[in-house]
Amino acid sequence: MAASRLDFGEVETFLDRHPELFEDYLMRKGKQELVDKWLQRHSSGQGASDLRPALAGASSLAQSSARGSTGIGGGAGPQGSANSHPASGGGESAGVPLSPSWASGSRGDGNLQRRASQKELRKSFARSKAIHVNRTYDEQVTSRAQEPLSSVRRRALLRKASSLPPTTAHILSALLESRVNLPQYPPTAIDYKCHLKKHNERQFFLELVKDISNDLDLTSLSYKILIFVCLMVDADRCSLFLVEGAAAGKKTLVSKFFDVHAGTPLLPCSTTENSNEVQVPWGKGIIGYVGEHGETVNIPDAYQDRRFNDEIDKLTGYKTKSLLCMPIRNSDGEIIGVAQAINKVPEGAPFTEDDEKVMQMYLPFCGIAISNAQLFAASRKEYERSRALLEVVNDLFEEQTDLEKIVKKIMHRAQTLLKCERCSVLLLEDIESPVVKFTKSFELMSPKCSADAENSFKESVEKSSYSDWLINNSIAELVASTGLPVNVSDAYQDPRFDAEADQISGFHIRSVLCVPIWNSNHQIIGVAQVLNRLDGKPFDDADQRLFEAFVIFCGLGINNTIMYDQVKKSWAKQSVALDVLSYHATCSKAEVDKFKAANIPLVSELAIDDIHFDDFSLDVDAMITAALRMFMELGMVQKFKIDYETLCRWLLTVRKNYRMVLYHNWRHAFNVCQLMFAMLTTAGFQEILTEVEILAVIVGCLCHDLDHRGTNNAFQAKSDSALAQLYGTSATLEHHHFNHAVMILQSEGHNIFANLSSKEYSDLMQLLKQSILATDLTLYFERRTEFFELVSKGAYDWSITSHRDVFRSMLMTACDLGAVTKPWEISRQVAELVTSEFFEQGDRERSELKLTPSAIFDRNRKDELPRLQLEWIDSICMPLYQALVKVNAKLKPMLDSVAANRRKWEELHQKRLQVSAASPVPSSPSPAVAGEDRL
């Protein structure tokens, strides 16, 4: 098969589109000789010679470099070197062609300046080679060259991505980076403009207008205007003053470039903020007069005019003779600046009317250009401020756990945003108190004002400990008490400012901006204050609005951090309380030792395998031994390797965590477990359920009412209790019972499931949760329809997981309601206990919630108990046990007992009706008893 031929042009085009592949290949397999050749071709002869010590291994390059340097030193000069040709036989490396631009920049001795980029390139290449040298494998023998293109590109992209800081702050900064760039149009040369002025004044004027119309940078635009005005009127020097402070009503004329010559470069050599800045008060001097009145001033001799101020001349030694001053207006006719031309050339000549006319024609264009540049600068400033606010939000979301860190971030952002010398944050001790008292203060000084910015960050807990604090406390307290911002442009003129404290501190305060910090509930939690703008100007309205918006986010962040600290302390208190309670809620070692050494009676002796077991036959200790016997009889101790001492401790702790309520107590839990044990052993369900399922239902029976408070789910919802808030209104108590069971199991020395495998443990905990939640009658009503249908159709399949789940749920409910299946005396006694507990709940509903309880909870209607029991049996109990008998006929004694007990309740009900008929008493209709109200 013939190999495909590659076209070099196609390869080059592909590499142009994928430079990262070329870079990756060069970094992996590039040779030093290749880089030497590249440097030789793209550098001067002297530059190649300078590289010789670092690249001594490349002898051919050294020879060619020597020839190149000889030619330069031989007197050919820069011009000759630039036009020299390679020597014959030397190939590409024999001679080094020089660019004419190098000649113009050569030194007087004829030697050329070597480019700095060569040095940097050499360092970069050396670093990359060092990385390759330190590798412990040979890349030539790897299969990287055979990797597909997608793999190479993916690796290159990952390398790029890994070089970026993996923080949200850097990602946000990259996303918010402005994509708007200032247009760059190179102006025509000054010599060309001078030529046009002499030969074509119209074209000269158009060139000046065109050059300023394309510039949106106010600094370079101002510089251009000065130079062009000098050219137009033949002035020796020129100054431009722009109006500032108009919005605040305190106008000032400011010039960042003063006395610019016509022969200076078109771009300023210094861009330092406030460099060469001169401020002229509004209405003062000739500049101020022109700005205030908008008149043109043309003075042949400045010293003859009383408005002239010669202070600048005294400072600079420059003598002002003639002077032409003219206002600059925007499109609305407002004065936005003043242009001043000084000393007409030739020296001593005054400015003419033609000069005035030319300036009057040119300055309107300058006004338009300045307005556009100012608008662009304002939009950029607003963009930067909006970006800073977004970055503040990012900072606040990143740090919400440490108050000191978040306040420090806030102050750093405030200094960056407002460009101030000092920033402080004070937090109130008590936001509810009418007395303003600060409990914490944080302070940060700008690095420009402090040699060590980190050491300038201070925190003090007591107010007396920051007596050296430089912020005026009276202003901060005023803001905290009124909630209104305070902006002081001149601190020493404000009566609220303590000048004496300022002098003692050594930090001179000029201007103060202080705003309140609010939380989400619109309560003042502190104040934020900034001092002294770096440019020396007072804080303006824009600064105040920005600072107030900034502090809104800061207030939320500080409030969240304070709340987190409070929650953290509350959690610590809760942890301590739980530790104390768990100590008192667990059984003692003496109790464990007692039952560990006790002889456990047999099942026959305890009669716990009897479906008609007497619920009141055992005392509290006997119920523990009976529970131990059930675990041993079902083989769970041996099967799951349950430590016997742990089992004793767990049972005793479970008993201790049942409250002393009338019915839902430890005895009820044991009786439910006993009935489950009897059904498993008597009806043969032990053969149907797995060992894990049996363990789950037995443990579930013992734990299904842990920490029951004697009230039902409806009461928790009505009273909006802590349990309802924690678990919601669906199966509130059942979720609490399960979580309480888990807490006991996780306590030290109580995990009876410790020796189960991870899968068995996971399955068991899921089954345990299902078993406990199944005792909620709301869930019973939801699932019993499915169970009844499966039973009636004979479609029960024990291999189907959902069928087994429903069956276990029905078993749990049958055991929970099992008192109705016991002999009449036992069943009636249990019914009276349940009713008494319900009456206590009804009393609480009436007294605490101001509600009228339903019939089953109303003590005043206790004579209706037989009727309510009949409804209870007919609607809830009887259908369930009838279905279970269809599943297993061995459970028929339970159904028979239910029927027998119903007959007893029917007799009592009929007797009540007879008594009521003999002595009729008006009674309100009784409401239907909801199943969930029963348990």
UniProtKB/Swiss-Prot annotation:
It comes from Rattus norvegicus (Rat). InterPro entries: GAF, GAF-like_dom_sf, HD/PDEase_dom, PDEase, PDEase_catalytic_dom, PDEase_catalytic_dom_sf, PDEase_CS. A divalent metal cation 1 binds at H668, H704, D705, D816. Its cofactor is a divalent metal cation. 3',5'-cyclic GMP binds at S424. Keywords: Allosteric enzyme, cAMP, cGMP, Cytoplasm, Hydrolase, Metal-binding, Phosphoprotein, Repeat. GO terms for biological process: cAMP-mediated signaling; negative regulation of cAMP/PKA signal transduction; negative regulation of cGMP-mediated signaling. Plays a role in signal transduction by regulating the intracellular concentration of cyclic nucleotides cAMP and cGMP. Catalyzes the hydrolysis of both cAMP and cGMP to 5'-AMP and 5'-GMP, respectively. The active site is at H664 (proton donor). CDD domains: HDc. GO terms for cellular component: cytosol; perikaryon. Its EC number is 3.1.4.35, 3.1.4.53. Belongs to the cyclic nucleotide phosphodiesterase family. The modification Phosphoserine is found at S162, S163, S239. Transmembrane segments: none annotated. Residues 41-125, 915-935 are annotated as: Disordered. Residues 588-912 form the PDEase domain. A divalent metal cation 2 binds at D705. It is found in: Cytoplasm, Cytosol. Binds 2 divalent metal cations per subunit. Site 1 may preferentially bind zinc ions, while site 2 has a preference for magnesium and/or manganese ions. This is Dual 3',5'-cyclic-AMP and -GMP phosphodiesterase 11A. It catalyses: 3',5'-cyclic GMP + H2O = GMP + H(+); 3',5'-cyclic AMP + H2O = AMP + H(+). It comes from the Eukaryota. Isoform 1 is expressed in brain, heart, kidney and liver, but not in prostate. Isoform 2 is specifically expressed in testis. Isoform 3 is expressed in various tissues including brain, lung, skeletal muscle, spleen, testis and prostate.
